[in-house]
Regions:
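Extreme N-terminal leader/targeting segments of oxidoreductases
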Residues: 1-31, 49
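Active-site substrate-recognition segment that forms the wall
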Residues: 74, 106, 114-122, 208-210, ...
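Glycine-rich FAD pyrophosphate-binding loop
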Residues: 49-69
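Dinucleotide-binding Rossmann-like beta1-alpha1 core, especially the glycine-rich loop
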Residues: 77-158
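N-terminal Rossmann-like FAD-binding beta1-loop-alpha1 element of flavoenzymes
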Residues: 27-56
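Helix-loop-beta segment of a Rossmann-like dinucleotide-binding subdomain
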Residues: 20, 118-128, 160-194, 198, ...
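C-terminal catalytic lobe of FAD-dependent flavoproteins
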Residues: 307-423
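Helical element adjacent to the flavin cofactor pocket in flavoenzyme catalytic cores
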Residues: 137-145, 149, 168-230
Length: 439
């Protein structure tokens, strides 16, 4: 434990980001964005490309929060299956949402190519290895639904999953060839560079302290300045604070932790995810894992409710790595870090319009690389005057999570319970608890 670096692997391996200064004085713009994560920078980039003068204010450095700390998995779609979405939202609205979110990786990799972003981008696909026969049956239904919609998705046998993952613990799985991986911080910094090259302005260390409507425009106050604009986009996701209490109460921030091994020797590395896919398994507290460009295994899962590394989180993640890949027991771990994931009640991201000229996008439920990039484009299109019917994504009312003040306690208890349920299943070989699988 003494040699464990309490820092993100991505902060060590990403190219430097742009140098930005705090906001000072009174500025004006045609659009202002709060938050320089994937959502905010995607929105700013699309606005700047449309010729709008845009200012982004960021509370910290670019990438210090979720967009620079995640696993870098570019996953198509949202968690509910396509048929479920069409049943809940209707065939038209649900169908358009399925199409919009399913194409998320297309947008990510198109932006990377168009702006020359160096971020170790690899589009080898995304795997869902099944941890039980029941989970495999659900994956089979998911495959059928996506195939009906023309997606490049296939069901895998036990031997095929073994070949693609190098792990013998799974009984089959799903391969979605639309997905891929990026170095998440490098991708974010590349988006920031693209915003600046396109004429946008980004101010770091400029937390939004106050947001108010004044003389026909929105005004954002920061410690050393202010910016006013007719349109403001709130893009703070799980880190939304008092700038919008009503938005903060629509989601529950849940910690996610990751560990990274030292570079794996070549003879071992060739047997682990040999084709370069990312994977997220089907445990209730799913484990997501991938290799980085340096040959390190990166694995993450839900953590305890603390943003500081906890011994039990470290031990849980070490055990998970060795359960999936027992051949790595001699490989040291070099990095450990965590961040917050915004979870919503319906497991869907939300596009909100709390007031005229005020927009927000949040709640990616662990699929933020692709979905937040898409949300940024949707918010930009709405800010540019697109009608809601043109977006291909519904605008949701702002509805708080019931008993939000207690949601952290409930989520903490749920995480501990699901760890217990998954542990029983691993010991007993089958899951008997009545808990719905929604990986």
């Amino acid at each position: 434990m003494s040699a464990l670096k309490l820092q993100s692997l991505w902060s060590v391996t990403a190219p430097p980001g742009p140098l930005c200064s705090p906001l000072t004085g009174a500025q004006r713009a045609q659009a202002a964005v709060i938050g320089a994560g994937y959502t905010g920078l995607s929105a700013a980039l699309h606005l700047a490309e449309a010729g709008r003068e845009v200012v982004v204010v960021e509370a910290a450095e670019i990438g210090e929060r979720a967009s620079g700390l995640n696993g870098g998995q570019v996953i198509p779609g949202v968690k509910p299956d396509p048929d479920t979405l069409e049943r809940l939202l209707g065939p038209y609205t649900g169908g358009r949402l399925v199409a919009t979110t399913g194409a998320g990786p297309d947008l990510v990799f198109e932006l990377i190519a168009r702006h020359g972003i160096e971020c170790e981008a690899k589009r080898a696909g995304w795997l869902q290895p099944a941890t039980s026969e029941a989970a495999l049956e659900q994956l089979a239904r998911r495959v059928v639904q996506w195939l009906r919609r023309g997606a490049a998705v296939s069901l895998l046998s036990r031997s095929e999953v073994l070949q693609l993952t190098g792990s013998a613990i799974y009984c089959g799985g799903l391969l979605d060839r639309r997905g891929g991986t990026v170095q998440p911080l490098a991708y974010l910094r590349g988006l920031a560079q693209a915003v600046l090259r396109t004429g946008g302005r980004i101010h770091t260390h400029s937390p939004a302290l106050r947001l108010a409507r004044r003389t026909g425009a929105w005004s954002i106050d920061t410690p050393q300045g202010s910016v006013s604009a007719p349109v403001v986009i709130i893009a703070t996701d799980a880190y939304t604070d008092s700038i919008s209490e009503e938005l903060r109460r629509t989601m529950v921030p849940v910690p996610s932790f990751q560990v990274a091994t030292a570079p794996i020797p070549a003879e071992l590395r060739s047997t682990i995810l040999p084709e370069g896919q990312a994977a997220s398994d089907t445990w209730h507290l799913l484990r997501y894992f991938r290799l980085d460009a340096g040959g390190r295994l990166v694995l993450g899962s839900r953590g305890t409710f603390s943003q500081s590394p906890q011994l039990r989180d470290v031990q849980y993640h070490y055990h998970a790595v060795h359960e999936i890949y027992p051949q790595l027991k001699g490989i040291p771990f070099e990095y450990h870090w965590g961040g917050l994931v915004a979870m919503t009640q319906d497991q869907l991201p939300h596009l909100h319009e709390p007031a005229p000229g005020l927009l927000a996008g949040l709640g990616y439920n662990g699929r933020g690389v692709a979905m937040a990039t898409v949300m940024g484009r949707l918010l930009a299109r709405r800010a540019l005057g697109a009608q809601v019917a043109e977006l291909g994504f519904p605008v949701s009312p702002v509805v708080p999570v019931p008993f939000h003040a207690l949601s952290g306690i409930g989520a903490r208890a749920t995480i501990q319970y699901l760890r217990f349920v998954d542990g029983l299943a691993r010991v007993g070989g089958r899951l008997r608890a009545h808990v719905p699988f929604r990986a």
